[in-house]
């Protein structure tokens, strides 16, 4: 009775108790676990079907099995608050301050008018419905606590599913077998696991590993040999795949966090000395094997800490994740109460990409909790924290019970994934979220009497769960039909499917049908950027309205204002219809590329501009128009000068403003371009008039020597410039007198040269030089110099400079 009084979850028994067999609650939890794991195995492709199966499972359980106990009112109120807060984004935007970028969207004719805060209201409604289903399933699970013995086998079922997932993933990776429920057509599919992101798979395996620890502890103390024999290898498979097959550094880090969390909160009565000793020995053994073995996860952790050989930065330096965090905070600043709407982060984030500017638009902020705040608002985030806090606080009253190690292992497995959610998005994939939800419900539901109060509160909850079950069952059936029976897909998946249908219609020459389908879909999927592109292309290819095509393309660019690829692709589409529209689009692409490069997204604007010029050469007007954009940077001006036959280098050299902007490297490129273009006399006069340029002109001077066949002089100039050692090592007399040549290649060559065996020396060098190894090329140059063949020596030296990234000559 004292234990029950200490736990706020325990309800006093009424006088009209009816026997209620506990196996029904166990059966309800088993159904939820099976539904969640089915969703996990289908998460790589059949997303609607995966959620549909879980909803059908949860719906049937709610309809068939009345709750074993009354769920406390505070949980209902907090869940209702979370749901209500997440729906605030469906309020009119006019009720709140409107960000400037949103006002800018009103200028685009092709973009439909959206009076709500959410730019994709149908998608937001879909995700709100899924959130409601998740909360209902979670509350239902709390209403079905199970006895310790049943919890052991339900947890074992989940663990075996995790181990099976890991085993199948290992088999697929090692044999090349294609898992039938994983779509690898994404832009960067992981090479291990069947989620689209390595961290999703890692989070699943971390939860399984921690779950296994609780089961092993329970099986050992409770003398359950079968459970022990199944849990130990399952633990091994999960941990082994995490450490040596997965490349997720977060998986390794949060495995350590989860194990520590489990051990720390076990309590003194359960944290025995044998347990601690065995844990330390096991952890030390696993850590030693991990550190001495080769694995991508280990390499990525070392690089992240600045310890890897290829690491160019230390902890957090240049980390894109922190930049995305920063930009996401600006979204939260603009939408603190309502959020932007569930499911809209990827649509809104391009307007906030400053620190994290890149061509690729993140579809999440690298944090589940930040995503909740950005999409649902700060109130929803605080309510979620409050709900989690109450649940964990309430379950801690059971820490002195015999089943606490297993219960806490299940809690720790779920909490570890949630902690991982601060720096990544494991629950962003909702199919994994169902598994975490089921784990939390299994562990956080406190055990009740084996009888149920048939009070008014119980009857109300029974009715609510029955209605929710019917709704979930119907929704699950609809999702399954959408996935596998060709029904219309739900909004998050509808837009991309329509885009594919439009492409198919255009491929069949049915442009008018494609145009009609595109216009009809705009109001339903207003933020699907590909829809505007395909609509514009349909108008162009079908001899439709060029004005409509322009408007559609403008809307696509407006929805991703940082992209360089979108205006470039649009320029390509216009080339066969109206090439005059291509130049300004490519100019926009060039400007966006420059901004991305300045933000550290990707480099080599010069190479990008050069590709544009190469594509434009067959079109003189386009080629000439691109020259106007060379003023973006001196580097581009130099590329333009080298490419355009109409530019006179002498005229450019008389522009002091341009010359003053040049860095030493740009000066060198300018002189090389001038030398290659001709006008050697004017170039020589320029250098005589500007002696401060002489140092940057040395590649030109070397080329002038080569044109005069002064190879020895050119070699000497390069030798001085790069401080090269073009001599063989001096060997000790005892080495020269020995019968065995040295092992080192340069010493070996010196050995044969000193003994007058130049033929063998050249043979020793030949293999290394043919493989373009720098040392072999350097030695070939030295041997050629010794033989008096300066031209051959220069050829070898130039190859050496190219291989060492120093061969930049006209």
What positions do the PLM features span?
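Internal/C-terminal transmembrane anchor helices
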Residues: 274-291, 456-484
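Flexible juxtamembrane loops connecting transmembrane helices in multi-pass membrane enzymes
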Residues: 190-194, 258-259, 288-327, 333, ...
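Short coil turns that delineate tetratricopeptide repeat
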Residues: 492, 526-527, 561, 594-603, ...
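TM-adjacent membrane-interface loops and short helices in multi-pass inner/ER membrane proteins
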Residues: 197, 315, 322-362, 369-372, ...
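Alpha-helical transmembrane segments of multi-pass inner-membrane proteins
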Residues: 13, 20-45, 51-64, 83-86, ...
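Alpha-helical repeat scaffolds
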Residues: 513-519, 546-557, 581-594, 618-633, ...
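Alpha-solenoid helical repeat scaffolds
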Residues: 499-500, 530-534, 564-570, 601-611, ...
